[in-house]
Structures are given as C-alpha cells and as structure tokens.
Amino acid sequence: MPHRWDSANYARADVRCDYLDRFIANQAEKGEHFTYNDILIAAIVRMYSERIQMNRFVVGNKIYDRYDLTIAFAVKKVLKDNASETVVKVNFDGSESIFDVRDKLKAAFEDNSGSKVNNDLDLFMNKLLKLPAWLLRFFMSCVRWADRHNILAGSLVELSPFHNSCFVTFLKSIKCDFIYHHVYEFGTTGLFVAMGKEKKAAIVNEANEIIPGKVMTVGLTMDERIADGLYYANTLRYFTTLMSRPEMLLKRTEPKFTKELVNERHDRLMEENR
C-alpha cells in the first residue's frame, strides 16, 4: 500500500471518567492541577516511549525512525466561530512525567493564544499566501516532490504541521464527541488522536455491578505500515491502561528519542542481525 490514506486503521479507546476525575482530585489536594488534556498527552508520550516502533514514518515505501517525538495540535486563538487558529508542535524525548508534559502544554497554549499572537508557522503562511496563485502552486508542487523523496528542507519540516509523530485534536474542549480523524498524505504523521467529550454510559464497578457512569472516548487513526497487528494491539492496550491509571505517569522514565539514542538502537539492531 503506497499511500497513507489506504493504509489507515481505526480504533477507539473508551476511558472511564471516574478514574481520571479521581486522579485529578487527588493531585489537587497536593496542590497539583491537571486536566484531561494533560493526562491524554502524557499517556501518548509514555506510550511512544515504551512502544518505540510507533515513532516511525513511511516515505517513498521506506520506513524511517524519528530522531524526536513531536506532538502537534491546533489552538483556537479565541473561542469564536470566526477566530483564526494555529498549529502548535511540542517536542519530547520520551522521558517526561505528567508534570513535565503539563508545563510544556501550558507554555504552548499561553504562547499561542490571543487574536494578535502569530507564531513562526503563522508568519510563514502569511508570506506564502501573498504569492501569486501560479507561483504558490509551483512552490507547493516542489515541496510535495521533496516530501515524497524525504529531502524536504529541515526548516520547512520544523514549521510544517504535517511532519510530526502524532496529531491530537481536543474535541472535548468544544463539547464535541470523538471522531476518526482523516490522515494526511503529505507529511509524516502516523497517528491521529481525537479526544471526545464525556457522555453517560453503563459501567461495571469493583463489585462487578452495572452502574451509571461517564465515559470519554478517544478515536485513533493509524498508519498500519509502521508496525504489525500484534504490535498495534499491545500498544492500544497499553495506552488504555495509561489512561485508566494516570498515576503511572507521575514518574519520569529514561529518554528514548534523541539522534544519538536512535542511532545507537539502530546500530545495535544491525549488529544483532549480522
């Protein structure tokens, strides 16, 4: 399958809100404040850290390992229908605790909120859209060609909202249920995660009784070429466990995604396969 759109698999994770609410309340008693967004991103970071094959991408029918872990998400500058939005990319090395993730997210939201705030991507797009239509089409055709051959300039990759490990959409924040987000053929995004709003559902308590409760559903769209079915299944189970037990995210772990560490793993694998 040469394309990302015809290699897309879909899955959902139903997370009991009482687990999340209990964790948030317990941490609030200690003076630490977390949101569902913090838990979701921290769980994604830890998932990539422990399931490192997920941090790969396919270009030109070849699979590549990433040197970094980058999560992107859209930020509405003002919560109004006609307000502009931007895309923010946050870098991790896989070692982060939920405290580290929360602080990085808070800084990213604060730096990119406000109707008069423009980040580097906004400034670049403003200049790009001033080009004549024919020149813009030519520029984009060159960019797409370079992307297909994995030779796109590093400065453009750094700016691009389509070149990342994972793209997250916080639909809960606009009171919308989860979706299965479409994939982009352009770029390298291998996983889309859409967090929906809470909704009432029947749940089973510790006494094995069916009781009313709340569930939040997370929709995932994945490029199946980066790992096999068993690896994906185990990864999804691990992700669901992290979302149900956020206390697992309180401590840091070893960094996994730097150029040196990725190359070391690659060299070790090549040596083992000789």
Q: What positions do the PLM features span?
A:
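C-terminal catalytic/motor cores of large multi-domain enzyme assemblies
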Residues: 1-274
